[in-house]
């Protein structure tokens, strides 16, 4: 049973968010949470909260055991960009883009050992 959670319009550029997200893809939930707690990047606490939310959804809505969950898919999409202005010399302005991200995680149960595949 797949469980999905998503956070939208996070004020982190997608490129920087993907650096953190790539570290936890495919890991068991317990390991992914442990890794995110020690990463210094701005995206780490956001992803940590998202994983905890997905685990709570799995436990509450589908009666799944959080100890048997793993990160099946996690990806970052680009959100809207906001234009902001940066003052320059001689009364001119430069354009700055404030980038945002949408982060989606899909958790699934670990397959049982010895269970037939297919």
UniProtKB/Swiss-Prot annotation:
Checking InterPro entries in the record gives: Ribosomal_uL22 (IPR001063), Ribosomal_uL22_bac/chlpt-type (IPR005727), Ribosomal_uL22_bac/org-type (IPR047867), Ribosomal_uL22_CS (IPR018260), Ribosomal_uL22_sf (IPR036394)
Coiled coil feature spans: none
Please provide, alphabetically and separated by semicolons, the GO molecular function terms listed in this UniProt record.
rRNA binding; structural constituent of ribosome
Keywords, sorted A to Z: Ribonucleoprotein, Ribosomal protein, RNA-binding, rRNA-binding
Q: Which family does it belong to?
A: Belongs to the universal ribosomal protein uL22 family.
Write down the PANTHER family for this protein, in alphabetical order: CHLOROPLAST 50S RIBOSOMAL PROTEIN L22-RELATED (PTHR13501), LARGE RIBOSOMAL SUBUNIT PROTEIN UL22M (PTHR13501:SF8)
Q: What protein is this chain from?
A: Large ribosomal subunit protein uL22
Question: Whose protein is this, by species?
Answer: Thermomicrobium roseum (strain ATCC 27502 / DSM 5159 / P-2)
């Amino acid at each position: 049973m797949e469980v999905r959670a998503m956070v939208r319009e996070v004020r982190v550029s997608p490129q920087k968010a993907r650096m953190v997200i790539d570290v936890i893809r495919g890991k068991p939930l317990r390991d992914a949470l442990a890794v995110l707690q020690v990463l210094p990047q701005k995206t780490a606490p956001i992803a940590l909260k998202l994983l905890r939310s997905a685990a709570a959804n799995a436990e509450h809505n589908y009666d799944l055991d959080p100890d048997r969950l793993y990160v099946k898919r996690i990806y970052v999409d680009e959100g809207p960009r906001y234009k902001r202005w940066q003052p320059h010399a001689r009364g001119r302005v430069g354009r700055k883009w404030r980038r945002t991200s949408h982060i989606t995680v899909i958790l699934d149960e670990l397959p049982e050992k010895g269970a037939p595949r297919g």
